[in-house]
From Swiss-Prot:
EC number(s) stated in the UniProt entry for this protein: 3.6.5.2
Protein name: ADP-ribosylation factor 1-like 1
Origin species: Caenorhabditis elegans
InterPro entries on file: P-loop_NTPase (IPR027417), Small_GTP-bd (IPR005225), Small_GTPase_ARF (IPR024156), Small_GTPase_ARF/SAR (IPR006689)
Topological category with respect to the lipid bilayer: Lipid-anchor
Keyword Membrane: yes
Residues binding GTP: G24, L25, D26, G27, A28, G29, K30, T31, T32, N126, K127, Q128, D129, A160
Subcellular location as annotated: Golgi apparatus membrane
Length: 179
């Protein structure tokens, strides 16, 4: 009997699939976030040369997350990951104030890409545990997110090691996928 209701439930409320592209400058914490979401563990990482791809399931949403390296030489390859992206997750090291202008430039370059025009934007203001971290409100101004008039976006403070804020971001993605 339980199997019957399980089958009915999955038919009436199927998993929503979301192709997610996670980008940001090198050292922002993208890979640490990916594996915190996937394994609920903090893993030791090395700079990503190329990409990592993992499937993360969260409350009836299946996210295929493409984590692409953020080194300057690799950024030219980002465009090959754009097709069919539902959600763009842009990770910013909120404690590295000197690189925030560079992050803003890369973000706005991404947002100008026609293949990403319909994607939702989730900004993870990562490393909130660092003493000099900028708050999400400060990063909203520094990244000029308020100027984005024709795109759904959300920013939340995160700590990839503890998981703080990550599920808040996924809840926003879930809400966007249902609308």
């Amino acid at each position: 009997m339980g199997l019957f209701f399980s089958k009915i439930s999955s038919f009436m409320f199927p998993n929503i699939e979301c192709r997610t592209l996670m980008l940001g400058l090198d050292g922002a914490g993208k890979t640490t976030i990916l594996y915190k979401l996937k394994l609920n563990e903090t893993v030791n990482t090395i700079p990503t040369i190329g990409f990592n791809v993992e499937t993360v399931t969260f409350q009836k949403i299946t996210l295929t997350v493409w984590d692409v390296g953020g080194q300057k030489k690799i950024r030219a390859l980002w465009k090959y990951y754009f097709p069919n992206t539902t959600t763009l997750v842009f990770v910013v090291d909120s404690s590295d104030i000197e690189r925030i202008p560079e992050a803003k430039e890369e973000l706005f370059s991404l947002l100008a890409e026609p293949e990403l025009a319909d994607s939702h934007l989730l900004v993870f203001a990562n490393k909130q545990d660092m003493p000099n971290a900028r708050s999400p409100a400060e990063l909203t101004q520094l990244l000029d997110l308020g100027s984005l008039k024709n795109r759904e976006w959300f920013i939340c403070g995160t700590n990839a090691h503890s998981g703080q804020g990550l599920y808040e971001g996924l809840m926003w993605v879930k809400k966007q996928m249902k609308t």
